[in-house]
Amino acid sequence: MKELFELINDNCKYVVLRNWEDVYNEYVYGSGGDDIDILCEDKALFIKLTGAKRLHGNIFRDNYFVAFGRLKVRFDIRWVGDGYYPTKMERLILENRKQTEEGIFIPDDKEFFYSLSYHALLQKRSLSDKYLFKLQHIFNSTFPNPYVLNEEIILNKWKEYLCDNQIKITIPNDPAVIINWANVKKLGYEKNIMRLISRFWYRFILRINSRLKH
């Protein structure tokens, strides 16, 4: 795994979006383990360098795996312009990235706060205590004059961020990514008809398949 990251470090602009502390731990990310969440500038280049293969037949899904001998490590490969985050935000994350002592590129503290809070508030059905605790820790160490966070306060921080950077929330290209519509509508979003249709059909087919199995 270390050799893989050394290769992409030299050839491809990327970050590991979260949970990078255990990236080299095969018990966490080995076969059947967690996914490594990647944001890269050039998805085709990342796939070419790593030899990543699709996990699913659906071309809109961004789930891949890379084989390391007997291990198959799963990657969720996000890329600039895919709507997983707003495009301008994806560029900011990559432009402001930093490198860990282990040689892995990750978001800087400010972009990590916003990327993780986006994931926790807009890509989960509800804000969990686990994410709130982590966001509070990042907030305390990153922003001046920190205070106690809750969902409403984080959404207000997001309204400021969107206004300051002239960004709109986007619909992800990957139809399997959860959208918390209640929170998305509070912030407003950039409408993309094709992605909404793709999402509708993906959910429809899932329901049909589920009924057929029963």
Predicted features and spans:
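Glycine-rich phosphate-binding loop of ATP-dependent small-molecule kinases
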Residues: 187-214
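Short, low-complexity, polar/charged sequence segments that are solvent-exposed and flexible
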Residues: 34-36, 57-59, 93-99
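Catalytic cores of NTP-dependent nucleotidyl/adenyl transfer enzymes across multiple folds
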Residues: 79-197
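Short secondary-structure junctions
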Residues: 11-16, 48-63
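Active-site nucleotide-donor binding segment shared across nucleotidyl transfer reactions
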Residues: 1-47, 214
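Low-complexity, flexible helical/coil segments
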Residues: 49-56, 73-75, 110-117
